[in-house]
C-alpha cells in the first residue's frame, strides 16, 4: 500500500542531502506521481518500446529500478522465450520493496533483483536497457563511462531508454518550464514549504543536463540514432538505438 508523501510538510531544522532511504521508499509511488509530470505515460509507453525491441534469448536491464515500475512494464510486454530482466538499485529500502512488487505479479519472464551499484554491473547480451530518472544522480564525470558500457553491452538493434529531468540552454525557456513544473506540484497538493525543502535537499545530488548534452554523450558512446520521444515541461525521455549492423 502506498502512503501519501508528507515528508517535508513541517519545517526541517537541518536539511541534508537527498537519500533514497526507508522514509522515501515508503511514499515513493505517491511522491513520483505528484512530482514528475508524465511519469505514468513514460512507464506505460516503456512497455510498448519493450514489445518492439526485446528479442528472444536476450536480457533487459533496469538500471536504478527503484520499486520496479519500469521492470513490471517491460515484463508485461515480453512475449519471447528465454528472456530475463535484471533490475538493479543501490537503495536497500527500494530493493526490498521492489522484490515484493515483482513477486506479487506472476509472469513467465524471470527477474533478478540486485542490490548494487549500476556502475559495477556488467551489461551483456542486452536488447533493451532502461535508465529511468537515474543518470541525473551520478556525478557528471561518471555518466559517459556508463553510457559507453551500455552501448557495448547492447546487441545490434538494441535500445536504451533514458528518462531525465532536463536543464535548458535557453534560459527563458528553462525558467518557464521550471515554473510550470512547480505549478504542477502545487496543483498536486504540495505546499511552498514542501517544494522548497525538497528542492534544497536535491540540489547537490541531482545535477541535470540539457537534451543536447545527453545527445552528445549518446553519440560519443556510439549510438547512431537518438531522439526525444516524450517530454512534459522539464522532464522527458530519449530513446537511443544501436545500429542493426553494428559490430
UniProtKB/Swiss-Prot annotation:
Which example biological process does GO assign this protein? Answer: tRNA wobble uridine modification
Q: Which UniProt keywords apply?
A: S-adenosyl-L-methionine, Transferase
Catalyzed reactions per annotation: prephenate + S-adenosyl-L-methionine = carboxy-S-adenosyl-L-methionine + 3-phenylpyruvate + H2O
- Record-linked Pfam families: Methyltransf_25
Q: Which amino acids does the record list as binding S-adenosyl-L-methionine? A: 39, 64-66, 89-90, 117-118, 132, 199
UniProt keyword Nuclease, yes or no: no
Domain of life according to the entry: Bacteria
Q: Which GO terms describe its molecular function?
A: carboxyl- or carbamoyltransferase activity; S-adenosyl-L-methionine binding
Say if the entry is tagged with keyword Ribonucleoprotein.
no
Q: EC annotation?
A: 2.1.3.-
What is the purpose of this protein?
A: Catalyzes the conversion of S-adenosyl-L-methionine (SAM) to carboxy-S-adenosyl-L-methionine (Cx-SAM).
Q: Can you tell me which family this protein belongs to?
A: Belongs to the class I-like SAM-binding methyltransferase superfamily. Cx-SAM synthase family.
How is this protein organized at the quaternary level?
A: Homodimer.
HAMAP family xref list: Cx_SAM_synthase
Task: Tell me what this protein is called.
Answer: Carboxy-S-adenosyl-L-methionine synthase
Organism name: Shigella boydii serotype 4 (strain Sb227)
